[in-house]
Each structure stands twice: as structure tokens, then as C-alpha cells.
Amino acid sequence: MHQTHRFALPALAALALAACGKSEAPAAPAVAPTELAAIETPPPAYPIELACAGAGGQTVLKVTVGPEGTPTEVALVKSSGQTQLDQLAQEKVREWKFRAATRNGQPVAQTIQVPVDFKPPVPKPDECFAIEERAKRGG
């Protein structure tokens, strides 16, 4: 009799499951979107001649970061007032690395605006005085 009960329970469980009818596969869990994140964003070089002259400003760039995490487009939105600084900012930002934004678990392109600040050092570096002396002497 014990053996009958042992086989009856699994059979009843199978019948109960079959009676429930077809169950639909559970919906795939929604994957939360993630935003773009900076990984490696070193500042551009600040030419010492411009820094010593007190030339500075803020360059604003429109940057499209592709699914692979690198800038695919870089455009000037607002000039610092110094063409050389604007160009240096654009060149350096093209080298930056990001963790791409994701939608439904897949990396996607995203466009952001990036301000790049150039602030003259205070106090002036000693190198500035040497540059000024050379300029006074005509070379």
C-alpha cells in the first residue's frame, strides 16, 4: 500500500498542473535605462602663453557619444573667445571615454553639452615671468 501512495502523489501533482492549462511564459523583466557616464575625461592642455596672458573662458561643446562609449560628433556651441582654446577643447573631448547610455539593456548614442573651462592660474606660474622677459627682449 505504501508503494501505491508513492506513485499516486506524483501522478496527482502532474494532473493538477495539467488542469491549470497552458501558462504563458513570464514576461521578461524590464531593464532600467542607464544614463551616460564619464569614465576618462582629462582636461585639455592650457597653452602657457595664453594662461600667462590671462586669456581664458568657457567653451561649450555638443558631444554625441556612440554606443561604444566614444564621441562620434563634437561641435562648438559657445566659444570661449579664444579660437585656440576652442580647438584644444574639441580635440581633447574627441579622446574622452564614456560608459554609454542604455535602453532595454542595449547601449545607445546620446548627445550632451559639455562645458570646458579655461581659467588662468593665480598666481602666475614662474614660467610666465620668463616668457614676459623673453618678449621684452624681442624673442
Segments and roles (model prediction):
Residues 16-19:
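C-terminal motif of bacterial Sec signal peptides marking the signal peptidase cleavage site
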